[in-house]
Amino acid sequence: MALFVRLLALALALALGPAATLAGPAKSPYQLVLQHSRLRGRQHGPNVCAVQKVIGTNRKYFTNCKQWYQRKICGKSTVISYECCPGYEKVPGEKGCPAALPLSNLYETLGVVGSTTTQLYTDRTEKLRPEMEGPGSFTIFAPSNEAWASLPAEVLDSLVSNVNIELLNALRYHMVGRRVLTDELKHGMTLTSMYQNSNIQIHHYPNGIVTVNCARLLKADHHATNGVVHLIDKVISTITNNIQQIIEIEDTFETLRAAVAASGLNTMLEGNGQYTLLAPTNEAFEKIPSETLNRILGDPEALRDLLNNHILKSAMCAEAIVAGLSVETLEGTTLEVGCSGDMLTINGKAIISNKDILATNGVIHYIDELLIPDSAKTLFELAAESDVSTAIDLFRQAGLGNHLSGSERLTLLAPLNSVFKDGTPPIDAHTRNLLRNHIIKDQLASKYLYHGQTLETLGGKKLRVFVYRNSLCIENSCIAAHDKRGRYGTLFTMDRVLTPPMGTVMDVLKGDNRFSMLVAAIQSAGLTETLNREGVYTVFAPTNEAFRALPPRERSRLLGDAKELANILKYHIGDEILVSGGIGALVRLKSLQGDKLEVSLKNNVVSVNKEPVAEPDIMATNGVVHVITNVLQPPANRPQERGDELADSALEIFKQASAFSRASQRSVRLAPVYQKLLERMKH
């Protein structure tokens, strides 16, 4: 009975445990990082925390999971050391840090956390030490000794030359008139300091970094009998101006100041809120070609997008960045903010020349390059940053440059440079027309395209959209990269030159002498009307050589039986359009005959029923034609399944003839005019 009771109690504890955990308060990011550091240090004894130190510096961080495995902070290697967690100390002869630190008053606790310089300056004032040692409840954000030592000499001199006013006020600004622990330090909050009730800005980032006026907490939550001490890495000062006021008084922001005024963003930048302004200097504007800069400054929408691309939705202090971080601007562009040693980077470039200029409504970082968003660019400017320079040169040579730099609403279908590895076509009337058919008469976004949609080109063609499981294609060409949406135009990067349809499937087959036997067979089987009318077909078209490679007996049987011939031909026709870019590892395509075709793509080679396609993607208005060098057999007609006496030998002849046909068919090709023009460029 006693055993049963114990088991029942254990079961209840297990059942209630998770519920109790869920009901408890969520830990702050700082506490979660501290907890991880404890876990990593527990092998060294109780209350031991793992700390990462950046090699060659005195910078230390409690370690999170990602940093633990990477062993890097801001790209610099780190070493792991093990220290007592906050609030604990070693005991001689004992493992780890088993003893809690004895509580003392704030003044004495400053010495415990290593802020002896703050103690020294406190002693110099007449009033502050008695307050720190007396009754009450306070929080002090105490600068480290290194923080005091790094102050400019003139600043330090001004403080110590008037200790009972300047120094006292500076120290009081680091204090709050109540106990505040890290769990209460919320991102974006302000605390009222003990100096003229001036605000202190608090930011608590998801990576566990906590900043006070952009100074990082080094050692937090050291309890005292009359409050708590947090050690920080900088001496902080009062914040008086908002972002707009700083822009107005700094000479290096003359151009930015004019741009902000013209855009109407000054109201936001002087209002409430918390922002990060990546503030371009005058030199940053001067680096932009005058034509581009004048165009943007003269376009209110582009100008607003440009400036919003330099504003983040919350305050981001430099100390919060310990690795690459994706952040979204007010304009909507994602920037990669990172660090390399002591330098901040944007999109991998060290363009921040001055950081952590604090404002009442955020923080400013000076940058030496303008961050022009796609939404403020022309199609030419979008293409300059993409792998489509060869295509852009062709558009320019063809006299289409005005369409790519003007204010027409267009979408450019630009093939990748790799498409032209074998050369580019001469610029003639056919090439110009082809290129015009790579420009859509509307500014599109790929996320709104749908299967079967038609798009009108500058060349007057109607192009179809095909949506597949893993690709989005326009005719035979598929989108190879994310859209770039500019001020008026959108850039689609395409995986090949687009071939507009030149006629129906029957027109395509009749126009190519490789298919004369297939055309005759289609006519004999009564399928001409089917392949001439509107529809969505995928035709695997056997060449003349494919028919000649059939065993004579098989060929005679087919040509002598219209019903059987129609059955075979329908097996070559899929009931939807499948271009090569839409083929995954394996697609089962239903044929008009009823059985399914197995279509696959491996190493950029399309195969149907495991036989390679000689030439894919000849587009027609009612489908697509893929050239094959063998005649496909429906499952019920294959020699092995019919028990044909000549099955083995016929199959061997078929394979040999198919191999010969694949080798020889290229010499007899007669392609439509666009395909001849692009023959050298096709994959």
Curated annotation (Swiss-Prot):
Changing residue 538 to R: In CDL1; delayed age of onset. It comes from the Eukaryota. Changing residue 124 to S: In CDGG1; late-onset; mild ocular irritation and reduction in visual acuity. Pfam families: Fasciclin. Changing residue 626 to R: In CDL1; delayed age of onset. GO terms for molecular function: cell adhesion molecule binding; collagen binding; extracellular matrix binding; extracellular matrix structural constituent; identical protein binding; integrin binding. Gamma-carboxylation is controversial. Gamma-carboxyglutamated; gamma-carboxyglutamate residues are formed by vitamin K dependent carboxylation; these residues may be required for binding to calcium. According to a more recent report, does not contain vitamin K-dependent gamma-carboxyglutamate residues. The EMI domain contains 2 expected intradomain disulfide bridges (Cys-49-Cys85 and Cys-84-Cys-97) and one unusual interdomain disulfide bridge to the second FAS1 domain (Cys-74-Cys-339). This arrangement violates the predicted disulfide bridge pattern of an EMI domain. Induction: By TGF-beta. The modification S-cysteinyl cysteine is found at residue 65. Disulfide bonds join 49-85, 74-339, 84-97, 214-317, 473-478. The modification Phosphoserine is found at residue 37. One of its GO terms (biological process) is extracellular matrix organization. Highly expressed in the corneal epithelium. Expressed in heart, placenta, lung, liver, skeletal muscle, kidney and pancreas. Changing residue 623 to D: In CDL1; delayed age of onset. PROSITE patterns: EMI, FAS1. Changing residue 572 to R: In CDL1; late-onset. Changing residue 555 to Q: In CDTB; originally thought to cause CDRB. The keyword Repeat applies. GO terms for cellular component: basement membrane; collagen-containing extracellular matrix; extracellular exosome; extracellular matrix; extracellular region; extracellular space; plasma membrane; trans-Golgi network. Plays a role in cell adhesion. May play a role in cell-collagen interactions. It is linked to Corneal dystrophy, epithelial basement membrane: A bilateral anterior corneal dystrophy characterized by grayish epithelial fingerprint lines, geographic map-like lines, and dots (or microcysts) on slit-lamp examination. Pathologic studies show abnormal, redundant basement membrane and intraepithelial lacunae filled with cellular debris. Binds to type I, II, and IV collagens. This is Transforming growth factor-beta-induced protein ig-h3. It comes from Homo sapiens (Human).
